[in-house]
Amino acid sequence: MENDAGENVDLYVPRKCSASNRIIHAKDHASVQLSIVDVDPETGRQTDGSKTYAICGEIRRMGESDDCIVRLAKKDGIITKNF
């Protein structure tokens, strides 16, 4: 879609669930997006790095969101493997 200036713009870019790879629809009001930032261990301040997880409403409805977040965080190295 183009605006008045002739630039390409997207009105809506759908997100995908990080746990199940399902598309999160615009009307999925039960979905959440979590941003986990990297913290400097010496100063306790936020660094430039971050990781974002999107969990769809269906995963939350089944009560599996906490397990999915732990699994994704282990895979990305945020949580140790023997947690």
From Swiss-Prot:
Keyword presence, Transmembrane: no
One GO BP: endonucleolytic cleavage in ITS1 to separate SSU-rRNA from 5.8S rRNA and LSU-rRNA from tricistronic rRNA transcript (SSU-rRNA, 5.8S rRNA, LSU-rRNA)
Superkingdom assignment: Eukaryota
Record key words, sorted: Cytoplasm, Developmental protein, Endoplasmic reticulum, Ribonucleoprotein, Ribosomal protein, rRNA processing, Translation regulation
One GO CC annotation: cytosolic small ribosomal subunit
Transmembrane segment boundaries: none
Location within or outside the cell: Cytoplasm, Cytosol; Cytoplasm; Rough endoplasmic reticulum
One annotated GO molecular function: ribosome binding
Keyword rRNA-binding included in the entry's annotation: no
InterPro entries: Ribosomal_eS21 (IPR001931), Ribosomal_eS21_CS (IPR018279), Ribosomal_eS21_sf (IPR038579)
PANTHER family in the cross-refs: 40S RIBOSOMAL PROTEIN S21
Record note on quaternary structure: Component of the 40S small ribosomal subunit. Interacts with sta.
Family: Belongs to the eukaryotic ribosomal protein eS21 family.
Protein name: Small ribosomal subunit protein eS21
Organism: Drosophila melanogaster
Gene: RpS21
